[in-house]
Amino acid sequence: MMVSPPQEDTVFNTDSDPVYEQATDDMTFNDTTTDGNGQESVPLEALTVVEIEKTSKGFGFNIVGGTDNPHFVGDIGIYVSSVNSESKSYGVVRTGDKILSFDGIDMTYKTHDEAVEVFRSVKIGHVAKMLIDREYLHLQEDRTQTPTASVSITPQVTPQTRSTQNNTDTPKSMSHSESKSRLTSHGLSAVIERIRGKVYEEEDAQSVTSYAPSTHSIIDDVPRTPRKPLSLLDPRNNSWLTEALYVSIGLGALTISGYLAYRFIRGRR
């Protein structure tokens, strides 16, 4: 499975460098990863690969977070906020799971809308592999949670899909040994370091600047009202027409003032 770096324009573009190396069956893995100082970080046992299927009702769980809408202060990750008990994801995905990658797409540096689009782009019936950190939520207990808007990974309900479907053959979580053969050593280290906050300074500079809840969701896809254009007389309008208009008004006022002064002086003689 490929774990690609974050993309800005498209979530499926993996052409830019660098890309992490391809996992092979003969790769060996350590039980723990190390940070830049050589100290042990999170063990691989904290990571879990699960398989989830998209049905006509979606994946059956909601997500929160993102670079523009962090769920925790200083944490830009994507989290599972709730799971539908009648969905196939129930028992496989849990509330509080942190999504690290989805079908090889790095989810650790996505905006909220980019993460939603990744899930929406999957076709019905597709079984996706999702790498999650199930123990990371315990590290956030002392952090202050900020208000966020939960987005449902479920399409809009129509009269044809209102009937309750019986879910069978629920996908099971993959074992730790099985997940090791599908994940890259370098890819996991990069994802974990990003999760733990050991990111580069340039990524910190691009970190979130607003903790406002996202107003965009799958089931509430209402476009925002466009901003009213500024008039030519509005001082906030920086167009050359506005500047020319104000210069003309100023020159006209000076001309009229000069003419009136001339008539006044001439009349007194």
UniProtKB/Swiss-Prot annotation:
Give the record's keywords alphabetically.
Membrane, Transmembrane, Transmembrane helix
User: Which Pfam families does the entry link to?
Assistant: PDZ
**Span list, region Disordered:** 143-185
Q: Where is the PDZ domain?
A: 49-121
Q: Where are the transmembrane segments?
A: 240-262
List, alphabetically, the PROSITE patterns matched.
PDZ
Q: What is the lineage of its organism?
A: Eukaryota, Metazoa, Ecdysozoa, Nematoda, Chromadorea
Q: Tell me what this protein is called.
A: Mitochondrial scaffolding protein 1
GO cellular component terms, alphabetically, are: membrane
Q: What species does this protein belong to?
A: Caenorhabditis elegans
Regions of compositional bias (Polar residues) in chain numbering: 145-174
